[in-house]
Amino acid sequence: KNWIFSFILVSSILVYFTIEKNNKEINVAILDSGVNTEHIKQNITTINFSADKHTKDSHNHGTAISNLVIQNITKANLYHLKVLDNNGESTPSNVEQAIDWCIKHNVDIVNISFGFPKYNYKISKKLDKLIENGTIVIASSGNNLGGKSDFPASKSNIISVGGLSKDFKISRYSSSGKIDIYNLSENIESINNQGKRELFSGNSFATALTTNEIIKMKQS
């Protein structure tokens, strides 16, 4: 059943977005709350753009997201750009700096498992430049209980991800509006910031799973 769902997911992505294959190592960036690298099997470079003085994941979000994004990925340079602080909060300036870094370092795929309730002009323009360079950006539509999608997932040139329950129904807390892909979002098993297995729920994790599939598509 999950294999069939993965096939449908990949087919849906191909309908709306062009994924150019690349047999070489690709650059993958995860914008989130930091990562406790000792709990991640793959090597991952961390860079801090938050107000914190470290790249550790005190919010118990970025480690789980990173683990899902990069599971079973081998030919990739992995980067975690910490833009969320220990409370899971960020500023537009933090995100702008991280996007500039992605542009400068020719990142191929960017995962954004969070969002802002309001549109931001500067972030939007920087994302446009990033995408014009060929970068694929995947973002969470938010957990807004049927409300409108968060920014930047609401942008037309970004792959916006909504959530599904285990029986493949739209999750009760999933956002509506502009959503390109739905993926599983409830009771997703990953690694927490203490290195233990934990079940997580939310469109953040549906986004991470979708990014993982897109990385595999690009490398297939």
Predicted regions and their residues:
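Substrate-binding/access-modulating region of protease and related hydrolase catalytic domains
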Residues: 84-156, 167-169, 195-207
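Structural recognition of the beta-strand scaffold that forms the well-ordered cores
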Residues: 27-31, 77-82, 108-113, 136-140, ...
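Buried hydrophobic packing segments
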Residues: 65-69, 102, 210-217
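Extracellular S/T/G-rich loop segment that most often corresponds to the catalytic His/Ser-adjacent loop
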Residues: 26, 32, 150-219
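Residues at the C-termini of beta-strands that transition into short coil/loop
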Residues: 47-53, 69, 82-84, 141, ...
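Active-site core segment of subtilase-fold serine proteases
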Residues: 19-79, 97, 167, 194
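N-terminal Sec-pathway targeting helices
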Residues: 1-8
